[in-house]
């Protein structure tokens, strides 16, 4: 069986393609990024509706696969079944709207965590697993900010919950909220 993260990545891509778009003041088309939960829910409903080809209120693995194909994305039988299984809480082998919403929410959280891990890696020195005053100083220098090691110690101490003088990934994630 294939990796379960693949269907989620594909889900996110599909949702982006199906989300309503708007024009900005320069006339370019951009994704609609509303922080309003109601707008986000309407967008999800539109995506769900598109995928629910037979309009029975549930998305089958086959409907999921066909939705991907119409947008030029490939999803194997196994990936479609795995994607549905990830959020199928009632065990009927299909996704209702609530289950679909949960799958998208999980994907959003995983994507944010991966982005944070990527940013965290930029700030750590090779062979380290935390941000040290020295590694922070080097990264800030690359970004055009000249700081002393003592300045960096002070910056780290503001988010250093366990007072060990460095930032772990969890402390970094808290800082980035």
From Swiss-Prot:
Tagged with keyword Metal-binding: yes
Source domain of life is Eukaryota
Enumerate the residues binding Ca(2+) 3: 160, 162, 164, 171
Q: Which GO terms describe its biological process?
A: cellular response to hypoxia; response to wounding
Q: Where are the transmembrane segments?
A: none
Q: Where does Ca(2+) 1 bind?
A: 52, 54, 56, 58, 63
Chain residues that bind Ca(2+) 2: 88, 90, 92, 94, 99
Bias (Polar residues) occurs at 1-11
A Pfam family annotated for this UniProt entry = EF-hand_8
The signal peptide here is none
Question: Is Metal-binding tagged as a keyword?
Answer: yes
Q: What residues does the EF-hand domain cover?
A: 39-74, 75-110, 111-146, 147-177
**Keywords in UniProt for this one?**
Calcium, Metal-binding, Repeat
Q: What induces it?
A: By touch, salt and hydrogen peroxide treatments, drought stress, wounding, dark and infection by the bacterial pathogen P.syringae.
Residue ranges for the region (Disordered) are: 1-44
Found, by tissue, as follows: Expressed in cotyledons and guard cells of young leaves. In mature root, expressed in the epidermis, trichoblasts, young lateral root and root tip. Expressed from stage 9 to 15 of flower development in anther wall.
GO MF term list: calcium ion binding
Listed under subunit, the entry gives: Binds to ABCG36.
What functional role does this protein have?
Potential calcium sensor that binds calcium in vitro.
Name of the protein this chain belongs to:
Calcium-binding protein CML38
From what organism does this protein derive? Arabidopsis thaliana (Mouse-ear cress)
């Amino acid at each position: 069986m294939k990796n379960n993260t693949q269907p989620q990545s594909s889900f996110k891509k599909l949702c982006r393609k199906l989300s309503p778009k708007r024009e900005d003041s320069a006339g370019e088309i951009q994704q609609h990024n509303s922080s309003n939960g109601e707008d986000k829910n309407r967008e999800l409903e539109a995506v769900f509706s598109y995928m629910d080809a037979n309009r029975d209120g549930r998305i089958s693995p086959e409907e999921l696969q066909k939705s991907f194909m119409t947008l030029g994305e490939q999803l194997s039988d196994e990936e479609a079944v795995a994607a549905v299984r990830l959020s199928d809480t009632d065990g009927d082998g299909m996704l209702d709207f609530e289950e679909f919403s949960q799958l998208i929410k999980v994907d959003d959280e995983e994507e944010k965590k991966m982005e944070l891990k990527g940013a965290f890696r930029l700030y750590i020195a090779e062979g380290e697993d935390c941000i040290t005053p020295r590694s922070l100083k080097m990264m800030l220098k690359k970004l055009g900010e000249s700081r002393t090691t003592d300045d960096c110690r002070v910056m780290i101490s503001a988010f250093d919950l366990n007072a060990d003088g460095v930032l772990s990934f969890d402390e970094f994630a808290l800082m980035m909220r």
